[in-house]
């Protein structure tokens, strides 16, 4: 480790990642931009992972390794983030791999665009052993605007492992929030967007690993609820409404219905929470999360809600599209969408 302040800090939370962590670390050390530090906080891993990390830290002084007692993902991420000294700070998960020019590209963009708080990029996908997985690329020319009060709320989303932001922006967010730990990357993007623009570049900057621990149906369901509630937290923040009480009641992986009801009451007529909730279930093909037996049951609920509520033209067009989609896909379940 060196006392010199680096240009860029990369932070990583590690937990029992012996099969992948060396590839992740080496991808940072091999960056074309070499003025960096890699802050790794290990979350109480066993010997195989720690042996690898200790060896790597001995071999390269740019690594700052902290061995911690088990504290969970959010606590470990925040501990690593707090140790970063660079004026620009990037994240990488312990099972993903940076492309060699990832940091150089993102630093160049942030230096050329002072109004941008954070920047991300696209990902290539691989399986547990590193084999490429073909994925449909999103249109890089499609512009998504940041609009928390739109219907539905619109977000420039940057996947966690591709994210780089200014240290000042990171500090202003207060870090990752544990109540949204199943969708912490979405929540942090909402928070960063309050500090400046968030930009998603069309360049592939990271290889993202897909394996059993991030593909399970239970993980998918928890992520969906967390994404929904994080967007409502962003709506509340945009409206200047304190949602601390509602957020403090969120039980990750538990019963989310009280939290949905809490935001419904908190936002009242300021935002159509019930309409958004039904729309979200339809768009995500996740009716079971709302207690509906199938897509047809959700479609019936949407129709009843539609008849009982006045509509403006733009919202009606969006809503009818979701309704038609739900009716066509009525036989699907959330498990098939996981």
What role is predicted for each listed range?
Residues 26-35:
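Short, acidic, metal-binding catalytic loop of nucleotide-sugar glycosyltransferases
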Residues 210-338:
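C-terminal subregions of glycosyltransferases and related glycan-biosynthesis enzymes
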């Amino acid at each position: 480790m060196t006392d010199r302040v680096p240009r860029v800090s990369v932070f990583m939370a590690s937990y029992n990642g012996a099969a992948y962590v060396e590839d992740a670390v080496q991808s940072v050390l091999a960056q074309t931009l070499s003025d960096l530090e890699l802050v790794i906080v290990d979350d109480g891993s066993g010997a195989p992972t720690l042996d690898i990390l200790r060896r790597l830290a001995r071999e390269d002084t740019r690594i700052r390794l902290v061995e911690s007692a088990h504290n969970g993902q959010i606590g470990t991420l925040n501990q690593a983030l707090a140790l970063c000294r660079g004026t620009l700070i990037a994240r990488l998960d312990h099972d993903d791999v940076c492309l060699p020019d990832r940091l150089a590209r993102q630093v160049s963009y942030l230096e050329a665009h002072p109004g941008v708080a954070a920047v991300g990029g696209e990902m290539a996908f691989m399986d547990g052993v590193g084999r490429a997985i073909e994925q449909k690329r999103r249109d890089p020319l499609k512009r998504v605007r940041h609009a928390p009060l739109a219907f539905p709320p619109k977000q420039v989303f940057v996947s966690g492992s591709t994210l780089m932001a200014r240290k000042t922006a990171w500090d202003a967010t207060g870090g990752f929030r544990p109540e949204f730990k199943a969708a912490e990357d979405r929540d942090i993007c909402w928070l960063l967007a309050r500090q400046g623009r968030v930009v998603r570049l069309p360049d592939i900057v990271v290889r993202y690993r897909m394996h059993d621990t991030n593909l399970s149906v239970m993980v998918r369901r928890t992520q969906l609820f967390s994404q929904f509630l994080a967007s409502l937290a962003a709506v509340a923040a945009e409206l200047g409404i304190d949602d601390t009480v509602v957020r403090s009641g969120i039980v990750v992986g538990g019963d989310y219905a009280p939290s949905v009801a809490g935001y419904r009451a908190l936002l009242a007529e300021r935002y159509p929470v019930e309409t958004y909730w039904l729309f979200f279930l339809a768009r995500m093909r996740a009716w079971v999360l709302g207690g509906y037996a199938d897509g047809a049951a959700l479609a019936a609920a949407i129709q009843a809600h539609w008849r009982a509520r006045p509509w403006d033209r733009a919202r009606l067009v969006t809503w009818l599209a979701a309704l038609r989609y739900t009716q066509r896909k009525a036989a699907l379940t959330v498990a098939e969408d996981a």
